[in-house]
Amino acid sequence: MKTLLLTLVVVTIVCLDLGYTLKCNKLIPIASKTCPAGKNLCYKMFMMSDLTIPVKRGCIDVCPKNSHLVKYVCCNTDRCN
């Protein structure tokens, strides 16, 4: 009976597909945050005048287009930014 119950619990967890939560770095890379639902990308924003130091990091739903002043780099794995 215990085996049957354990099997049902495992099957339920697998079938529910509990979902995956993405973690993105904040501005300071040692700190990260869990992205809210619908925000499936991590991003880094750079000023075009200095592409070596990101000025903003976080979660986003759609990667913005680059402009003459700002460059965005987006990715979709944990802490990839």
Curated annotation (Swiss-Prot):
PROSITE patterns: SNAKE_TOXIN (PS00272). Disulfide bonds join C24-C42, C35-C59, C63-C74, C75-C80. It is found in: Secreted; Target cell membrane. GO terms for molecular function: toxin activity. It comes from the Eukaryota. CDD domains: TFP_snake_toxin (cd00206). Residues 1-21 form the signal peptide. The keyword Signal applies. Its main location: secreted. InterPro entries: Cytotoxin_Cobra (IPR003572), Snake_3FTx (IPR003571), Snake_toxin-like_sf (IPR045860), Snake_toxin_con_site (IPR018354), Toxin_cobra-type (IPR054131). One of its GO terms (biological process) is killing of cells of another organism. Gene3D superfamilies: CD59. GO terms for cellular component: extracellular region; membrane; other organism cell membrane. Keywords: Cardiotoxin, Cytolysis, Disulfide bond, Membrane, Secreted, Signal, Target cell membrane, Target membrane, Toxin. Expressed by the venom gland. Monomer in solution; Homodimer and oligomer in the presence of negatively charged lipids forming a pore with a size ranging between 20 and 30 Angstroms. Belongs to the three-finger toxin family. Short-chain subfamily. Type IA cytotoxin sub-subfamily. Shows cytolytic activity on many different cells by forming pore in lipid membranes. In vivo, increases heart rate or kills the animal by cardiac arrest. In addition, it binds to heparin with high affinity, interacts with Kv channel-interacting protein 1 (KCNIP1) in a calcium-independent manner, and binds to integrin alpha-V/beta-3 (ITGAV/ITGB3) with moderate affinity. This is Cytotoxin 1c.
